[in-house]
């Protein structure tokens, strides 16, 4: 039991040190989930501790920043 908890903690700490690009890819994939799917995984969203509203706003900003205007 103790070993399993250590492994989980290790995984969590390594995730925090992932390069920014990979984090953005992960975020985008998470945001593409439908609202229904988000309700199916309440525990996962609690672990991330990121409010969905802030999440979507941040994503929209990133998307607008990447999209060339008037192209």
From Swiss-Prot:
Its main location: nucleus. Keywords: Nucleus. Pfam families: SNURF (PF07192). GO terms for cellular component: nuclear speck; nucleus. InterPro entries: SNURF. It comes from the Eukaryota. One of its GO terms (molecular function) is ATPase binding. It is found in: Nucleus. The keyword ATP-binding does not apply. Encoded on a bicistronic transcript that code for two proteins, SNRPN and SNURF. Only the primary 1.6-kb bicistronic SNURF-SNRPN transcript is detected. This is SNRPN upstream reading frame protein. The gene is Snurf.
